[in-house]
Amino acid sequence: FYPCMPYAHKYANAATEHGLIEALRRFLPQDGALSGMLQAGKSLASKDIEGILQLLVDAEMKMFQGLNTPVIFMQNVIVDLLYGLGIHEAFRMFADHVKSRYDAEPGFITMNLPALLDVLERQGVDNPIVCANINKIGFRMSGGLPLYEQIIATRRVRPIAMSVLASGALPAREAVEYVCR
């Protein structure tokens, strides 16, 4: 399994349907649920980004307990939001937590590979696994196709292609041949 988290809509819906305390109780690991709620409250009150991030990851990983999860991805909505807000240290915090707590590699999903890769390098996330739009016609590829090709050829990154078919604009064989070369 390759979990992708945190799924923000799930938390918003749960808080709306069940209230904040019940939502926290449902998503926090059962062992130490009270301490988890206290930690969540403390992290939110102090705006402790690392504590909040760890709680969200741990809550999501609860459903994968006992399963092999070699890579844990941070969802693109969160990645690109943190990038845009300039909270770049959160990427290092996520990477460190995923490695130390789950013995997994961190992965990042983004709509802007060039910008994110620069930030990850500055944060010390070496040779990251990054899932981004990569396709033959440059569909939704921030910076354009030539820049992505240059990055993939010259920089330390392990890319995973999404939107390979460019939202149906490319025939499957042509699309797959491009990303596999």
Residue ranges of predicted features:
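Active-site beta->alpha loop and helix N-cap motifs at the rims of alpha/beta catalytic domains
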Residues: F1-L85
